[in-house]
């Protein structure tokens, strides 16, 4: 009896932590208006060229990225030619969600176009400045990328 009870308790505690469903994480999010410029040359961002670069993927300006203006810097893009260049993130704030394409480095969390932060905050990006969001990496197709 003791063994069955202990096994049941262990299973109840362990099973939720082994779920295949990805868990969302939290991060800071801020904006930078230079990402709002559709003519922003991708030659000037961390994810410029190289095997993982956005130019190599066929995009020369921010406005050419399919889900523009939902672009910006991500803390996951640490250096030039990072394997995280072009990754798509589902970013949520107060039940509003955008799908963000990482094109640059951010020192802390995400740093995105003001237009995108306005979508998340109902036009309050400038007022709020920095917010806490939940995020998870998702399929690049959700950002319109192949």
Swiss-Prot record:
**Presence of keyword Secreted:** yes
Per UniProt, subcellular location reads as:
Secreted
Question: Which Gene3D superfamilies does its entry note?
Answer: RlpA-like domain
Q: Does the keyword Transcription apply?
A: no
Query: One GO cellular component from the entry?
Result: extracellular region
Any signal peptide, and if so, which residues? 1-20
Matching entries from InterPro entries are given as: Cerato-platanin, RlpA-like_sf
Q: Which Pfam families match?
A: Cerato-platanin
Modification after translation (UniProt): Glycosylated.
SUPFAM superfamilies with a match to the protein in the record: Barwin-like endoglucanases
Source species, domain of life: Eukaryota
Q: Which UniProt keywords apply?
A: Glycoprotein, Secreted, Signal
Q: Which CDD domains match?
A: DPBB_CEPL-like
Q: What's the family?
A: Belongs to the cerato-platanin family.
Could you identify this protein by its name? Heat-stable 19 kDa antigen
Task: Tell me which species this is from.
Answer: Coccidioides posadasii (strain RMSCC 757 / Silveira)
The gene behind this protein is: CSA
């Amino acid at each position: 009896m003791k063994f069955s009870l202990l096994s049941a308790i262990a299973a109840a505690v362990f099973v939720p932590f082994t779920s295949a469903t990805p868990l969302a994480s939290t991060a800071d999010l801020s904006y930078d208006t230079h990402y709002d410029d559709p003519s922003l040359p991708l030659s000037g961002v961390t994810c410029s060229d190289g095997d993982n670069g956005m130019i190599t993927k066929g995009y020369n300006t921010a406005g050419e990225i399919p889900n523009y203006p939902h672009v910006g810097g991500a803390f996951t893009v640490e250096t030039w030619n990072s394997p995280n260049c072009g990754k798509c993130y589902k970013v949520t704030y107060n039940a509003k969600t955008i799908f963000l394409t990482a094109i640059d480095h951010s020192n802390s969390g995400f740093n995105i176009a003001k237009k995108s932060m306005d979508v998340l905050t109902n036009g309050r990006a400038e007022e709020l400045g920095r917010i806490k969001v939940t995020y998870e990496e998702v399929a690049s197709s959700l950002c319109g990328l192949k």
